[in-house]
């Protein structure tokens, strides 16, 4: 990432004690990871070092995230909201652990509307393709009876690649027919089977996202 100018800091609206909330988000799959506070010093140190620093309200000191645990956050980008009083940090989370509990995200509890204040422990919200791969990979490591995904994985390359060929042909035909609904459906089927192939070969969906992210803005090949 190119160094960011600290000039924008003067446009931010810090609260009465000089703090601003900062939400960190995974730079690849968009998962919301944690929320903490920054003051001007923390933000300036973040920009200078390229690693995220917060302000600890309990300890009243600068907090270099992950300095002790090793789970540092590498800054990829910063946005602020329309009122300039909340920061959104795009970060690469070292070790994929941002919460002190050992969870990937601090936002792992969702209130169950059918319960009385109980919560369910869930993975962080992320984009649909990343969530789909998470489920596929879970089937890969923890098979479930009568699972279509597991039947594909058990069939190996022969079964998986045959389905990719079939779904590719169906996608092409949908495009030839210019049927928007069919194109969307066939694209979804094709993406699913591509992800099954990735899981079968031990390639993480994040690896694909990282390739795409790194290609963004890169010189085009002839």
UniProtKB/Swiss-Prot annotation:
It is found in: Cytoplasm. Residues 129-222 are annotated as: Phosphoribosyl-ATP pyrophosphohydrolase. Its main location: cytoplasm. The keyword Manganese does not apply. Keywords: Amino-acid biosynthesis, ATP-binding, Cytoplasm, Histidine biosynthesis, Hydrolase, Multifunctional enzyme, Nucleotide-binding. This is Histidine biosynthesis bifunctional protein HisIE. GO terms for biological process: L-histidine biosynthetic process. The gene is hisI. Its EC number is 3.5.4.19, 3.6.1.31. It catalyses: 1-(5-phospho-beta-D-ribosyl)-ATP + H2O = 1-(5-phospho-beta-D-ribosyl)-5'-AMP + diphosphate + H(+); 1-(5-phospho-beta-D-ribosyl)-5'-AMP + H2O = 1-(5-phospho-beta-D-ribosyl)-5-[(5-phospho-beta-D-ribosylamino)methylideneamino]imidazole-4-carboxamide. Pathway: Amino-acid biosynthesis; L-histidine biosynthesis; L-histidine from 5-phospho-alpha-D-ribose 1-diphosphate: step 2/9; Amino-acid biosynthesis; L-histidine biosynthesis; L-histidine from 5-phospho-alpha-D-ribose 1-diphosphate: step 3/9. It comes from the Bacteria. NCBIfam families: histidine_hisI (TIGR03188), PRK00051.1 (NF000768), PRK02759.1 (NF002747). InterPro entries: His_synth_HisIE, HisE, PRA-CH, PRib-ATP_PPHydrolase-like, PRib_AMP_CycHydrolase_dom, PRib_AMP_CycHydrolase_sf. GO terms for cellular component: cytoplasm. HAMAP family: HisE, HisI, HisIE. Residues 1-128 are annotated as: Phosphoribosyl-AMP cyclohydrolase. Pfam families: PRA-CH (PF01502), PRA-PH (PF01503). The keyword Phosphoprotein does not apply. One of its GO terms (molecular function) is phosphoribosyl-ATP diphosphatase activity. In the N-terminal section; belongs to the PRA-CH family. In the C-terminal section; belongs to the PRA-PH family.
């Amino acid at each position: 990432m190119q160094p960011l100018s600290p000039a924008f800091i003067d446009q931010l609206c810090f609260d009465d004690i000089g703090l601003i909330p900062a939400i960190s988000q995974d730079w690849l799959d968009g998962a919301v990871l944690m929320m903490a506070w920054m003051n001007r010093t923390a933000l300036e140190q973040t920009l200078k070092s390229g690693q995220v620093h917060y302000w600890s309200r309990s300890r009243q000191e600068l907090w270099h995230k992950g300095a002790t645990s090793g789970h540092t956050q590498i800054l990829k980008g910063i946005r602020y909201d329309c009122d300039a009083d909340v920061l959104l940090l795009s970060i690469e989370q070292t070790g994929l652990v941002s919460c002190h509990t050992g969870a990937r995200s601090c936002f792992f509890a969702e209130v169950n509307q059918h319960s009385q204040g109980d919560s369910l422990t869930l993975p962080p919200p992320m984009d649909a393709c990343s969530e789909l791969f998470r489920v596929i990979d879970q089937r890969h490591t923890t098979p479930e009876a009568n699972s279509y995904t597991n039947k594909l994985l058990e069939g190996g390359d022969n079964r998986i690649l045959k389905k990719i060929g079939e779904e590719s042909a169906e996608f092409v035909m949908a495009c030839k027919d210019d049927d928007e609904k069919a194109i969307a459906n066939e694209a979804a089927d094709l993406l699913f089977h591509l992800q099954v192939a990735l899981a079968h070969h031990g390639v993480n969906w994040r690896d694909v996202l990282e390739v795409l992210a790194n290609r963004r803005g890169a010189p085009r090949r002839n």
